[in-house]
A protein has these predicted regions:
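Active-site entrance/lid segments in N-terminal catalytic domains of soluble metabolic enzymes
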Residues: 1-85
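Conserved active-site-proximal phosphate/metal-binding subdomains
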Residues: 45, 55-75, 79-90, 98-204
Length: 204
């Protein structure tokens, strides 16, 4: 989730005022307290990524109500909030940008950029196993699920064939990283490694 103490943790770093800092939010409501905290250190973020409910991976919504939200509305809410508060911070639309037409619509509505990730999982440059790339390429809507098996405890969107599903993984995460079990293992990573071992012939 959004760590409200991020600026406090970084404020003593020599590059605190030089390096670009961006945050990811899923609502204007989540943005408000972060900006309030950041203003204390005279260091607002350089850009804001607004991630919608159709993003791959972790979601900033509840497991039961993510379908009630849409990226266009959230981006507009954030843009209105920034304008009302006279904050000139670039906004990046993410999570549900499927086509060039989508990208143009967001840019024309006021976003400074768009973020596209899942589309590139099937490219040659992507390091996923070839079998997994084919799963992405051939997936239809029914092959995509939202669940709470992530070690973070947050809802996440994944393919139904994910090796994490059915592996017995339970939420066990703290703010600063995954908790290891008594033997020093991370269940999430172990599930991934098992998948690699079972499908070595498909890894390029």
């Amino acid at each position: 989730g959004l760590h409200l103490g991020s600026m406090e943790l970084m404020k003593e770093h020599p590059r605190f005022h030089d390096v670009l800092i961006g945050i990811i939010v899923s609502s204007a409501r989540a943005l408000r307290p972060f900006l309030k905290r950041a203003a204390k250190y005279k260091r607002l973020p350089d850009y804001i990524t607004v991630e919608g409910p159709l993003a791959g991976g972790h979601l900033g919504f509840g497991a039961d109500d993510w379908q009630e939200y849409d990226l266009k509305t959230i981006v507009n809410d954030v843009l209105v909030f920034l304008k009302e508060n006279e904050l000139n911070i670039p906004v990046v639309s993410a999570g549900g940008v499927f086509s060039g037409t989508d990208a143009v619509e967001f840019l024309e509505s006021g976003a400074s950029a768009v973020q596209v990730a899942t589309r590139f999982t099937v490219t040659h440059e992507c390091g996923l196993p070839e079998k997994t790339k084919h799963h992405y390429l051939e997936a239809v809507e029914d092959d995509i699920v939202v669940n709470t098996i992530s070690p973070t405890g947050y809802p996440m969107r994944m393919l139904r064939q994910s090796p994490g599903i059915g592996s017995g993984i339970r939420p066990n995460c703290e703010a600063f990283g995954y908790i290891l079990d008594s033997k020093g293992h991370c269940q999430y990573v172990d599930a991934y490694n098992r998948e690699l071992e079972e499908n070595t012939e498909n890894i390029s």
